[in-house]
Amino acid sequence: MKEYFKVLTIAGADSGGGAGVNADIKAVSACGGYAASAITAVTVQNTLGVKAVHDIPTEIISGQIKAVLDDIGADSVKIGMLSKKETVLTVASTLRNYGIKNIVLDPVMVSTSGHSLLLPDAVETLKKGLFPIVRIITPNIPEAEMLLGEKISDQKEMETFAEKLSLIAGNSVLLKAGHFSDNILSDVLYNAETKQISRYDNPKITTKNTHGTGCSLSSSLAAFLAKGLSLECAVENAENYLQNALREGSDYKIGSGHGPVKHFWRF
């Protein structure tokens, strides 16, 4: 019998379909994997922004994770929006029982539209409770600044701050450059396992359709890790996947605000 490489995504649901679990399932599927999910929150949102957030009870979150892992299993896990401290602790304690190596954490703190998606008291819990069991985190610049308590002013500083954040987090870091305005954006990987730095250069694509880019990158990364690729190769494949999804989706119009990327650009 054939087997899929399997990814469990633990994140919030997006009623607009562009980010969160909705984007994760599309990205993993587009990369050839099988996606299962544990929903941490239901968001009321569209391309114009987040209107409301309803947190799922922690026992239901834990139950979803156990139901998937006890039966289907997972070759990797992607973690996104966790919203509050209790959710962080629940996800960490539940996953700790399964010993999964490939855990990708996208430390979602603020939505594309500027809505807070992680309460301030949950940030320290994220560092202490979840970072120790994660293989790689994928912060953007504002998220890295919140985790470090320092300002990152330009791309030249990214290698230094990626390594600094890795020392704090105790795992590898993919620091994303998308918030800068340069023509070439260079995401930086600090591999904590090899102490090596890699840069991934991408031309900036001018488009409003950027909703869910962080979710799509981290979930495609989880898919390629589940497939058995090395960290560097998995990041390179995920970067290429997202760049194509951004470019191919740049001319589409969905809604009146920030539209999604084209997850199934290969088809």
Give, region by region, the residue ranges found by the protein language model.
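N-terminal basic/disordered segments at the start of proteins
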Residues: 17-33
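Conserved N-terminal subdomain of the carbohydrate kinase-like
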Residues: 2-9, 29-112, 264-267
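Phosphate-handling active-site elements
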Residues: 31-36, 197, 224-238
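Charged C-terminal helix
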Residues: 4, 55, 232-267
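Conserved phosphate/ATP/ADP-binding segment of small-molecule kinases
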Residues: 120-196
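Short pre-catalytic strand/loop immediately N-terminal to key active-site residues, enriched for Gly-Thr
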Residues: 10-16, 196-211
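Short, small-residue alpha-helix embedded
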Residues: 145-146, 207-231
